[in-house]
Amino acid sequence: MLIREVRADEYGLLSELAVSAKRHWGYPERWMEIWTPQLTFAYDYFEEHEGWAAIDDEKPIAFYTLEDNNGIAWLENLWVLPEYIGRSVGKELFHHATALARGRGYKSLQLEADPNALGFYERMGMKKIGERHSDVDGTPRILPIMEIAL
């Protein structure tokens, strides 16, 4: 597996990857309809956002974006194709992101986690530092805000 920068022309593939990864958690189809526009990247998204992809057999199998959030590294869009979940792909990308952020002088990395991914991020050493209350189609959700010191 190779990790490389996302190419701007991969926005369609990565949109499909993100939707597939979200659908893996068994969310209701109505919720997926609501979320799909948020998981669909515009053609210029990766020209404006730094993204890194895990590549297997010359195709993206997972990716993340890294942003500056008021001096804190913010990990966004860590998605893994369902058939690669449990094969250390997410772990490798997470370690890549923390090393990249640390190398740039950030003291911590934060993210907002899907509740289904909470255990993964805890295994990566992250701690819950807060939460964001949300709702989808009238159903309340609590999204944990996680942090790891670099």
Predicted regions, residues:
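Conserved beta-hairpin
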Residues: E50-A62
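Conserved GNAT-fold acetyl-CoA-binding loop/helix
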Residues: E16-F41
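Conserved acetyl-CoA pyrophosphate-binding loop and the N-cap/start of the following alpha-helix
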Residues: Y84, S88-H96
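Conserved GNAT acetyl-CoA-binding A-motif
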Residues: A101-A113
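Conserved catalytic-core motifs of GNAT/GCN5-like acyltransferases
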Residues: Q110-E112, K127-I145
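Conserved active-site tyrosine of GNAT-family acetyltransferases
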Residues: Y121-E122, M126
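A short beta-loop-alpha structural element at the N-terminal edge
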Residues: L2-E16
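Conserved beta-strand in the GNAT
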Residues: K59-E67, W74-W79
